[in-house]
Regions:
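Active-site hotspot residues in diverse enzymes, especially metal/ion-binding acidic/histidine motifs
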Residues: 1-190
């Protein structure tokens, strides 16, 4: 899993650069639109979920990725949850897609706020999402290192901010080295 994260995390930074996003909160829907990935609310996509036999799975998940064919995928999310949690759910599903977890005929339906014991693909999708919506280098450069500040600035829910804080604690003394991450930090700090 760590190799997957190391090889693919840069795609989150690359997307921030390609979309010109350089302020918080990061719009995960804008990222999805850039990737030409439709994002639907469960309330609008209920007929699709039922037709595909995914309705019950979706009702126990904040979000779901539905691969429809080669290069075609739809992300759906629970629109009854608050916006900060929905931002994380959509970012998490984009992580599954960018990390190659979306397989035709198999929907990802285990989306919930980060928690101990997550499977390696879930943990990897959470790490990817973290770098999209709360890039480590930017948080450290801006001094955004408390739960309250992360929640306020990045517009994420409590469990996501706890996950982000735990990753920051693991990276004390961290200095960005990837060219895309360095550029993301530079743009956010203008």
């Amino acid at each position: 899993m760590k190799n997957t994260y190391a090889k693919n995390i840069s795609s989150a930074w690359r997307l921030l650069l390609e979309t010109g996003i350089d302020t918080f909160p990061v719009s995960t829907k804008r990222i999805a639109a850039h990737l030409k990935i439709p994002v639907l609310r469960y309330s609008r996509g209920e007929p699709i979920l039922k037709e595909l036999g995914l309705y019950d799975a979706a009702m126990y998940s904040d979000g779901i990725t539905i691969p429809l064919g080669v290069g075609k995928v739809v992300v759906m999310y629970d629109d009854s949850i608050k916006t900060p949690r929905a931002r994380v759910a959509i970012g998490h599903e984009l992580g599954h897609i960018m990390l190659g977890h979306a397989t035709v005929g198999v929907a990802t339906a285990d989306n919930h706020p980060p928690r101990p014991g997550d499977t390696p693909p879930e943990f990897a999708a959470n790490l990817w999402c973290e770098q999209l919506i709360a890039p480590t280098g930017v948080l450290l450069a801006a001094g955004i290192t408390t739960r309250e500040t992360i929640e306020e600035v990045c517009q994420v829910n409590r469990r996501a901010s706890d996950f982000i804080l735990a990753r920051l604690a693991e990276r004390q003394g961290y200095t960005p080295s990837h060219p895309d991450e360095i550029e993301v930090v530079r743009r956010f700090m203008r």
